[in-house]
Amino acid sequence: MAAREQANSVRRSGFFNPFIGKRPFFRPGSGQTAETERPRPPQHSYCTEVGSFKFIAPRCLDEEAPADQRRGVHVGTLERPPKVYCDGSEYDVLNFASGGCWPRRIRVWNGQDFRGDGFNPRFERFHVYDIVETSESASHDDPSRFAELSRPSGSVVTLLGMSECGKRVAVHVYGVRHYFYMAKAEVDSACGITTEAELVRAMVDCAHSSALSAALGNGNGGKQSGGSGGGWWGGKHVSADCFKVETVCHTTLYYFGSKPALYYRVSASSSRLGGFICDNFHPEITKFEGSVDVTTRLLLDNENFTSFGWYRLRPGTHGERVQLRPVERHVTSSDVEINCTPDNLEPIPDEAAWPDYKLMCFDIECKAGTGNEMAFPVATNQEDLVIQISCLLYSLATQNHEHTLLFSLGSCDISEEYSFACVQRGEPRPTVLEFDSEYELLVAFLTFLKQYSPEFATGYNIVNFDWAYIVNKVTSVYNIKLDGYGKFNKGGLFKVWDIATNHFQKKSKVKINGLISLDMYSVATEKLKLPSYKLDAVVGDVLGEHKIDLPYKEIPSYYAGGPDRRGVIGEYCIQDSRLVGKLFFKYLPHLELSAVAKLARITLTRVIFDGQQIRVYTCLLKLARERNFILPDNRRRFDSQADAASETSELAMDSQSHAFDSTDEPDGVDGTPDAAGSGATSENGGGKPGVGRAVGYQGAKVLDPVSGFHVDPVVVFDFASLYPSIIQAHNLCFTTLALDEVDLAGLQPSVDYSTFEVGDQKLFFVHAHIRESLLGILLRDWLAMRKAVRARIPTSTPEEAVLLDKQQSAIKVICNSVYGFTGVANGLLPCLRIAATVTTIGRDMLLKTRDYVHSRWATRELLEDNFPGAIGFRNHKPYSVRVIYGDTDSVFIKFVGLTYEGVSELGDAMSRQISADLFRAPIKLECEKTFQRLLLITKKKYIGVINGGKMLMKGVDLVRKNNCSFINLYARHLVDLLLYDEDVATAAAEVTDVPPAEWVGRPLPSGFDKFGRVLVEAYNRITAPNLDVREFVMTAELSRSPESYTNKRLPHLTVYFKLAMRNEELPSVKERIPYVIVAQTEAAEREAGVVNSMRGTAQNPVVTKTARPQPKRKLLVSDLAEDPTYVSENDVPLNTDYYFSHLLGTISVTFKALFGNDVRTTENLLKRFIPETPHKTPTKTQALLERAGFEKLTPFTPEEESRRILHTVFCTLEAAPHQS
């Protein structure tokens, strides 16, 4: 202990507060100046030398100051380099040569070579994980072949990765040109030209025009996806050498009637120039593929090139060698940089191993600085500070936890107990880095990020909060440029922004060149179905662990409590990063996402943030190129910097991915919407961006369910991969669709093409022997690839099996995107006619299946003729068969007169017979499951039991995330009774067979007595004292910012505003807000008034002149919502009437199928079980009654009460009881 105290005293000696110290310090606006030399301009945009900076630090760190002087923050300017204190030593944050106090992988800093004399830059094989596109202008004295390819300016595609020998490398690929197409006849007519040379001159004139030249010089044309090294030289320098024009013959993708035609293929040396010309050269002329960036061109135009995987360097076509860049010309933080051309690269497609990439798992803690310290911090407020950042560093190759860093504003002592526990778990001891000011902490974090240079970063909600807070803070408060803190030293993309906001949710993206951000919050919301997605709830469900929580409102007091108390915050911060790291290696999201990137040939960042449309588009683009088709341009949609339109359109689709492999999801049903809005109908991407998923066709057919409780076996047939198989079987595609029979001249109906009635329109699709569907080819190849991958899994090592499983999952994801790709009006290549045809065929298949079953197996004799084995499966009931439900890709068939075991055994043969007799390959029905008992409620809502007693449910309230545990517990208990108890099941079947109105005047079957006892138990529990608030917590997602809601009178919004009113930590968008419903007390009424005023929904009661007292106005349920923590801490009474009514409502919606789907009748019948609340007679009145000779009644015993309830339920008089 003494040694520790001595170490602490040494550590504290370096801390400096400029407000009480004697070093040079200048307050803003004081008129003082510092006698310092002006620093030379930095060679790179990341900080390497800082002589003064804005000093902001909390006053609570002035531990010897009086208490009344320890609130708020110090703000000023400090004249000295940024410092960091670690283990009793002081370091200069930006002095690379001093060694530093955090791990570093970078070996070239500020143009200086720290690689060592023995460093060998040679390598042959290297792995790529990210790709960045830049522009470069070559100097006139550079004679290399690479300068010729970038003169006057050219695009460079940089492959970032690691060599097989462990060097961090950047391979700059020159000679990749941007190109697009224009119809020759249209161009010649518009420009009055006939030759390629004339077109070149016309484009040069376009670039030279005064207004456009200025725009070109300002970079308002084309696309920049990463760094922008080399600058830009303006439109005036554009010459004929910048362009290359060829006349080629192609066919446009849309419609069978399109014929091969001549097109000008215009290529430019840089994507900026090419994009500018595509946008501004005769905008009325239709362009093709102009929005395709040069990165995509590199990957698609070269065989087997991949966005994520291995390459080998080799001599070029004519023996050209790669060029090693000298250190002084490095533009990234890589160890080695190479110049090459595409022919110097040889992909290695079969190599699946990963190099030793590093993962940074981080978390930030913030604190409000002035006013109310309990308020939630805002990054743009200079007083709201980042006080701690935890960084845990892992090896992706070994999954080893290698380092733990804690950046702390002010002194911070991690307890010895916590450090020892880390060592005991096999984790490194935390290294604490302490800072005097927030600027120094943030600059140190960014410098560490640059110097350690991890390839991957993760955390929990880092996209919406951590990254966003850091970026906004350093740019708005400290004016730090971030373009040099990714892999590129200057001009790199380092940005967080919102990509879409619609009526459902808000989505953000973060793009940092050379750093892939994988947010585990997004992974959790996609993989799990939980009432809450707070980190504690997720790790509890996935890992079986629970975090030690530190409420936000306690952070200010802990932070002001000294180094030990700040250490508690540090342990909490480290704990969050550690748990997220465990989640990461549980789900391994990088493996699945990288497999998608490889298959779709797009970068990993685009896979994460740019939606599903781009995945199909690039695959279709490659196949179209091979088949001599060209794709119409959809500017501002393919571009990753302007995805808002297609992203917004995909929000609904992302959450409703179509069923592809039903074996992975036992109860999965194709998630296609049943109904469609009347959205945009144009098929060229027209319509306003950001207006949601606009479709203009009817959804899939649903055969109305025969609601009720079915105790005879019900077999469920599923169409395997329904929509992909329809596209394949019927050869559906852009290229096979004909809108007019004139285009089909010489072709025979049914033989050469099929006709479909879609709404009031006839659509024609030619068969594969006439023209093969490109979409069908993609699906066929992907399915074959997935089958081959899955076949390798059983014989692979565990490590290989994980990679293969992620690969087959990636193929499944892309296959499921194809139908949605055509059906989104604001997508990259919309064709609503294809999507409408798919759903039309799906409807017809359902109807054909129903009619086939009802005719082919109508009698027992017909069934046994088709399936002789059915003879042995008879039971005592008369035979019948009926399709009781059909939903998109599922058919429910009820058999009476056959045993459950028999139907289960015959199911596969039945599905095969239907597939063979009715459908084209690869469409096929599969026997998915057989229900022993099935409560079929309405469309998409059912509960049943299959073989082995497993319960399956879909769409019922019991599995909804927003129900409280009290309701879920009793609702589930009642469902268990219905499905597993013979007496209750028999009674339920009897109830279903009788018209529901009859049960109002007659007793329920006696088998329902167990059902009633559960309801009585629930009533007694809800009316008992000392309720556990946790059992009554409900949740709802904050899907968008509160001000974006049209209806603000929602329970979770009420709680949001109450938290704001009390200056509590506010939930983030997409976070689930917990709430309970409280009793209407005077306090609840007061707070409801305040909340309604805050959200602009206040209602002033109408005042009337009357002598009578006004009745108490009943508040809306939403006004009575309250934060569960506040209820527990303040003993606020719950609204028990609401909860029991909610329970009755929930189970009535579930069990209404027993009573003809009449909710009112169901609820009234269930209320028979509820004991009546006795009327309490006032004491004075009771005394008068006794004196008058009335006998005093004593309360019933519980046993008598139960007897009377059951008598009421099962011995009801024939006349209906009077309802008050």
Swiss-Prot record:
PROSITE patterns: DNA_POLYMERASE_B (PS00116). Its EC number is 2.7.7.7, 3.1.26.4. InterPro entries: DNA-dir_DNA_pol_B, DNA-dir_DNA_pol_B_CS, DNA-dir_DNA_pol_B_exonuc, DNA-dir_DNA_pol_B_multi_dom, DNA/RNA_pol_sf, DNA_pol_B_thumb, DNA_pol_palm_dom_sf, DNA_pol_type-B. The keyword Ribonucleoprotein does not apply. One of its GO terms (molecular function) is RNA-DNA hybrid ribonuclease activity. Residues 21-43, 641-691 are annotated as: Disordered. It catalyses: DNA(n) + a 2'-deoxyribonucleoside 5'-triphosphate = DNA(n+1) + diphosphate; Endonucleolytic cleavage to 5'-phosphomonoester. Residues 646-660 have a biased composition (Polar residues). Gene3D superfamilies: DNA polymerase family B, C-terminal domain, Helix hairpin bin, Palm domain of DNA polymerase, Ribonuclease H-like superfamily/Ribonuclease H. One of its GO terms (biological process) is response to salt. Keywords: DNA replication, DNA-binding, DNA-directed DNA polymerase, Endonuclease, Host nucleus, Hydrolase, Multifunctional enzyme, Nuclease, Nucleotidyltransferase, Transferase, Viral DNA replication. It is found in: Host nucleus. GO terms for cellular component: host cell nucleus. Replicates viral genomic DNA. The replication complex is composed of six viral proteins: the DNA polymerase, processivity factor, primase, primase-associated factor, helicase, and ssDNA-binding protein. Additionally, the polymerase contains an intrinsic ribonuclease H (RNase H) activity that specifically degrades RNA/DNA heteroduplexes or duplex DNA substrates in the 5' to 3' direction. Therefore, it can catalyze the excision of the RNA primers that initiate the synthesis of Okazaki fragments at a replication fork during viral DNA replication. Forms a complex with the ssDNA-binding protein, the DNA polymerase processivity factor, and the alkaline exonuclease. Interacts with the helicase-primase complex composed of the primase, the helicase and the primase-associated factor; this interaction may coordinate leading and lagging strand DNA synthesis at the replication fork. Belongs to the DNA polymerase type-B family. This is DNA polymerase catalytic subunit.
